Curated annotation (Swiss-Prot):
PANTHER family: ANKYRIN REPEAT PROTEIN, GH09064P. The keyword NADP does not apply. It comes from the Viruses. Keywords: ANK repeat, Repeat. This is Putative ankyrin repeat protein L66. Pfam families: Ank_2.
Length: 587
């Protein structure tokens, strides 16, 4: 049997399996020796035991712990076991732990909080019988049970004293937001029973925004003084037509006002065709807008925005509907086509092209599609014969990292060599290593370009790109003193790499040291000092900033180095402060 294998063979098995050994170790009599050998953490070991419900192994560990026959690293940890047993819903293990003295109230009543969060009703009932505190941590158990829809647990917690008004009435808000109608009625009745004043308008907005029709109807019927304004706008933006119609049936007057129009535009952008159609046919009435508004410009802008937002959404039926209402789509150099192309909505592009009666600048549309990585539209335009040789589409695709489009355009005659240096440098800034490598594979890059790219990549915190450029021969010495501030301001890992490759940092601007201290970046400060950066003094305002922000570790470090404080005179020269850092920190 597996358990009888000599531990030498187990060692070979472990070496072969790597990180996937823990479950196999659980069947070995050498479990504890091998777990220590593999450097498996106590938490990882216990997690595997409890998640799989191996209570006998847990009992065995406890027995060895009591007898002092087990490594301190993996001896019985009752609290950790309780936390994990609660998380994974192992009631039998929880009962075993409690019988052996584990406190169910550990970590601010963590067990009942997590059992409520994950919906373990049997565990919650057991913990309540064992006298846990269901209200701990701002009634966390009630809030999480509500959010996750565990109504039976919610009722049980409330019966045991959990506060339905906790955290500014969070439970009923969560029930409205996530659509639990039974819970909403339950909490609402609790409020009414004690004549509790609460924000009904907010509850209606939460339910409306989520499209929870039953809850909306319930709240409206139970209130005599509810306001619909915020909820109405939210319903339109989210596209909940049934709730919108219900509001209107209750006497809500929408009107053709700016808020309604803005909400309609948002509905267009989200593709809610049914809501847009209903509003335009019944409320906004584009045909009659001129009768209500003297400002033609405002009407024209609204119509254009309807079209552009619809193009963003990609909803062809809605676009056709708007056109049927007489809205013009040929404006601002075919902006609707360009927007559709930028979002890779090929079906809209084809439709708009098919109905266009004005000249279309296909080359500009190709550039926009390439810039935004819209390969379907790019291929369509190239198939239509759009010129790729004499425009900047390949440049736009390259600097934005869209290698697939770069290759496609190049294969169809686009001139990459014309822009390859500029693309190379831009990609160094943005970390588009795939494009950089492709350019290197095709062209001989001048050493000065490599060096310039290294500076750009270093300043923009692109570690992978920096490593590649150094590997390809970029010279670390090309990084000058005036480049240092931006580079040092980036991640420490990048700085360490550059130093390991020969970057010399003997001194830096004092204001950069101050910035590092005020940002509480102690690791970076220590590293710079280890490189020999002079930090015998700092400005008083920098030190005071550490005090104000309570950066204790930074303060302790500065004091331990006996850093001198300096201040600036009115003339702008630096003077030593009469107080040293220790005196200042005491003050």
């Amino acid at each position: 049997m597996t358990a009888d294998l000599p531990y030498e063979i187990w060692m070979n098995i472990i070496e072969y399996l790597g990180n996937d050994t823990i479950n196999l170790l659980l069947v070995s009599k050498y479990l504890f020796f091998l777990a220590t050998f593999c450097n498996i953490s106590k938490k990882k070991l216990y997690k595997s035991i409890i998640k799989n419900g191996y209570i006998d192994i847990l009992k065995y560990i406890r027995e060895l712990t009591v007898n002092g026959e087990i490594s301190a690293k993996i001896k019985m940890d009752k609290n950790l076991s309780m936390l994990l047993a609660t998380k994974y819903g192992k009631l039998n293990i929880i009962k075993y732990l409690v019988r052996n003295g584990t406190d169910i109230r550990i970590c601010n009543n963590y067990p009942v909080r997590k059992a409520s969060k994950y919906g373990y009703l049997d565990i919650v009932k057991y913990l309540i019988r064992e006298d846990c505190d269901v209200s701990d941590y701002d009634n966390y158990a009630l809030r999480k049970a509500t959010k996750n829809g565990y109504f039976e647990i919610v009722k049980l917690l409330v019966d045991q004293g959990a506060d339905v008004h906790c955290c500014d009435n969070a439970p009923i808000k969560l029930a409205c937001k996530y659509g639990y109608s039974k819970m909403v009625k339950f909490f609402h009745k609790k409020f009414l029973d004690v004549n509790y004043d609460f924000n009904e308008d907010l509850l209606l907005k939460l339910a409306s925004s989520g499209g929870h029709y039953k809850i909306v109807k319930y709240l409206v019927t139970k209130s005599n003084n509810i306001h619909f304004e915020d909820s109405l706008i939210s319903v339109i933006k989210k596209g909940h037509l049934d709730i919108l119609k219900y509001f209107i049936s209750k006497g809500v007057i929408l009107g053709n006002n700016k808020n309604i129009r803005n909400a309609t535009l948002m509905a267009c952008k989200k593709g809610h065709y049914n809501v847009v159609e209903y509003l335009i046919d019944n409320i906004i009435s584009i045909e009659n807008m001129k009768k209500k508004y003297s400002c033609d410009i405002e009407i024209d802008i609204f119509k254009k925005n309807l079209i552009t937002n619809t193009c963003i959404s990609g909803n062809l039926d809605m676009l056709k509907y708007l056109i049927s209402k007489g809205i013009n789509v040929a404006f601002e150099d075919n902006l609707p086509i360009k927007i559709s192309a930028c979002h890779d909505h090929l079906h809209l592009v084809k439709y708009l092209v098919s109905i266009s009666n004005v000249k279309i600048n296909y080359e500009n549309i190709l550039i926009s599609a390439s810039e935004n990585g819209c390969i379907k539209v790019v291929k369509y335009l190239v198939d239509k014969g759009v010129n790729v040789k004499d425009n900047t589409a390949i440049y736009s695709a390259g600097i934005n990292g869209y290698l697939q489009i770069v290759k496609f355009l190049e294969s169809n005659g686009a001139d990459l060599i014309k822009y390859h240096n500029e693309i190379f440098l831009e990609c160094s800034s943005n970390g588009y290593l795939n494009v950089i490598k492709y350019i290197v594979s095709k062209y001989n890059i001048n050493k000065s370009i490599y060096d310039k790219a290294l500076i750009i990549a270093s300043k923009n915190n692109q570690l992978k790109t920096v490593k590649y450029l150094v590997h390809m021969g970029a010279d670390i010495k090309s990084i000058k003193f005036h480049d240092m501030e931006k580079i040092i301001d980036n991640d420490l890992e990048l700085l360490k790499y550059l130093v390991s490759k020969g970057l010399k940092i003997n001194n830096i601007y004092k204001n950069l040291i101050s910035k590092i201290i005020m940002n509480n970046d102690l690791d970076k400060l220590k590293y710079l000092i280890s490189l020999g950066v002079n930090m015998k003094c700092i400005r008083i305002d920098t030190f005071n900033s550490c005090i104000q922000n309570r950066n204790k570790e930074m303060l302790s470090y500065l004091i331990s180095r006996k850093i001198k404080l300096i201040c600036y005179c009115e003339e702008g020269t630096e003077e030593d402060s009469e107080e040293d850092t220790e005196e200042d920190s005491e003050n």
